[in-house]
C-alpha cells in the first residue's frame, strides 16, 4: 500500500474550498435541545453529564469564575463530540489540526490572563517573581516565568493534537495490518483485529479524557486569574 500515512489528517476540500467550517457544525446535530416537557433518555444522560462535570470543575471557582460555566461546558462538549465523530470510518477529526487547537487555546488563555491583570494586577504580577527569590536570580526567574506563561496555550494545543493524532495513526496502522494479514493467516489476522477493537475502545476513552483535560486546564488558568 502506497497510501500516505497522514492522508486522513488532510483537511477535505470541495472545489478548493475547505469544508472544515461545515465539519465543525456537526456536533450541534448530536447535542440536541429538548423540545418537549419530558426529555428522552439521551437528553437525560446529556444533562446528567453536564451537571456532573459542572459540579466537579466549577466548585473551586468564585462568583466571577463561575460566569465561565457555559463557555467551559460548551468547550468540553464540542471537543468530546468532535473527537468521537472523528473515530467513525471515512470521517475527519478537526482536533488533529494544530491550527484549530491553537485557535481555541489562545483566546481562552488570553481571556483568563486579561481577567487576572484587570481584576488582580498585583497578584498577577506577583506570579512572575516567587516570594523569597535571591536578588541575583530575579531577572532570570522573571524571564522563565514569562516564557512559561506564554507557552501555556501552545502546550494545550500540542497536547490535544498529539494525543488524538497518535491514536488515529495506531488505528490506521493496525487496521492496515489486519487487512493485509487476512489473506496470509486468518489466525494472526483475528488476533490483530482483536487488538484493533481494544484500541478503538481505548481511543473512545482518550477522546473524552482529552476533552476533559483541555477544559480542566483552561479552568485552572481561570482559577489562577479570577
UniProtKB/Swiss-Prot annotation:
The keyword Transport applies. This is ATP synthase F(0) complex subunit a. Belongs to the ATPase A chain family. Keywords: ATP synthesis, CF(0), Hydrogen ion transport, Ion transport, Membrane, Mitochondrion, Mitochondrion inner membrane, Transmembrane, Transmembrane helix, Transport. It holds the Pfam family ATP-synt_A. Component of the ATP synthase complex composed at least of ATP5F1A/subunit alpha, ATP5F1B/subunit beta, ATP5MC1/subunit c (homooctomer), MT-ATP6/subunit a, MT-ATP8/subunit 8, ATP5ME/subunit e, ATP5MF/subunit f, ATP5MG/subunit g, ATP5MK/subunit k, ATP5MJ/subunit j, ATP5F1C/subunit gamma, ATP5F1D/subunit delta, ATP5F1E/subunit epsilon, ATP5PF/subunit F6, ATP5PB/subunit b, ATP5PD/subunit d, ATP5PO/subunit OSCP. The lineage of its organism: Eukaryota, Metazoa, Chordata, Craniata, Vertebrata. It catalyses: H(+)(in) = H(+)(out). It comes from Didelphis virginiana (North American opossum). It is found in: Mitochondrion inner membrane.
